[in-house]
UniProtKB/Swiss-Prot annotation:
Residues 82-85 are annotated as: Involved in Mg(2+) ion dislocation from EF-Tu. Associates with the EF-Tu.GDP complex and induces the exchange of GDP to GTP. It remains bound to the aminoacyl-tRNA.EF-Tu.GTP complex up to the GTP hydrolysis stage on the ribosome. GO terms for molecular function: translation elongation factor activity. Its main location: cytoplasm. It is found in: Cytoplasm. It comes from the Bacteria. Disulfide bonds: none annotated. This is Elongation factor Ts. SUPFAM superfamilies: Elongation factor Ts (EF-Ts), dimerisation domain, UBA-like. It comes from Anaeromyxobacter sp. (strain Fw109-5).
Length: 219
C-alpha cells in the first residue's frame, strides 16, 4: 500500500475540490491510487448529496457562453459553498456544460417548482382536451395529462432535461454527481438565454429590390 503524503492529498483536493480529510481518507482507502480515490469520494458523496443540498451555497461563478456564429448567448449563475471549489477545473467545467445545455436545449425554468401554476393548469387542460373526444374516463384523462406534463417538464425545465452530452442522464443527475465528486452543495440559481433577433419583426424585401440596392440602382 502506497504511503499517503501531503502532496498527494493536495493534488486530489485540487482535482476534486473535496475536503482535505476526505481526500486523505479516500487515498488511504484506495491504497494511494488516484482513480480509485476519486471513485471513493464519488460514492461517499452520493450518499451525502441530499444532506449537502440544505447547506448555504453563496460562492460560485457567473459564466457566459456564446454559441458558434454569435447567434445564441447564455449567462448562468451556478453556486457552491466555497471560493476554493469555484476556482477548480471540475466546477468550471460543470458550469460550462450547464451553459452549453441551456444554449442547446432552450429551457425556460431551472426547476419544475418555478413553473407558474397557471402554466401548469393550462398544460393539463390542453392535454385533457386533446383526449376527451376519445371518451375516456376522467381518471384516465388525468393520468394521461400528468404524463404529458412530465414531458413538458423534461422539455422546458433545465434540471429535468436530458443532458445533451449524455442523453440517458438528466441534468439533475449531472448536478448530483458533481456534488458527490466535489463534496459541496451546488445549485443552478438562474440563467438568461439570448437569441439574435428574437422577438423582432424582420423587414421583408423582395429579391429584385435587394439586387437593385446592391447594384446601387436604388436608394
Amino acid at each position: 500500500m502506497a504511503e499517503v503524503n501531503a502532496n498527494m492529498v493536495k493534488e486530489l483536493r485540487e482535482k476534486t475540490g473535496a475536503g482535505m480529510m476526505d481526500c486523505k481518507k479516500a487515498l488511504a482507502e484506495a491504497g494511494g491510487d488516484f482513480a480509485k480515490a476519486e471513485e471513493v469520494l464519488r460514492k461517499k458523496g452520493l450518499a451525502a448529496a441530499a444532506k449537502k443540498s440544505s447547506r448555504a451555497a453563496t460562492e460560485g461563478q457567473v459564466a457566459s457562453y456564446i454559441h458558434m456564429g454569435g447567434k445564441i448567448g447564455v449567462l448562468v449563475e451556478v453556486n457552491c459553498e466555497t471560493d476554493f471549489v469555484a476556482r477548480t477545473d471540475g466546477f468550471q467545467a460543470l458550469v460550462k456544460d450547464i451553459a452549453m445545455q441551456i444554449a442547446a436545449a432552450a429551457p425556460q425554468w431551472v426547476r419544475r417548482d418555478e413553473v407558474p401554476a397557471d402554466v401548469v393548469a393550462k398544460e393539463l387542460e390542453i392535454a385533457k382536451a386533446q383526449m376527451r373526444d376519445q371518451k375516456k374516463p376522467e381518471a384516465i384523462l388525468e393520468k394521461i395529462a400528468q404524463g404529458k406534463l412530465e414531458k413538458f417538464y423534461e422539455q422546458f425545465c433545465l434540471l429535468d432535461q436530458p443532458f445533451v452530452k449524455e442523453d440517458k442522464k438528466k441534468m439533475s443527475e449531472v448536478l448530483t454527481d458533481a456534488v458527490a465528486k466535489i463534496g459541496e452543495n451546488i445549485q443552478v440559481r438562474r440563467f438568461a438565454r439570448f437569441v439574435l433577433g428574437e422577438g423582432l419583426e424582420k423587414k421583408q424585401e423582395n429579391l429584385a429590390e435587394e439586387v437593385a440596392k446592391a447594384a446601387g440602382l436604388q436608394k
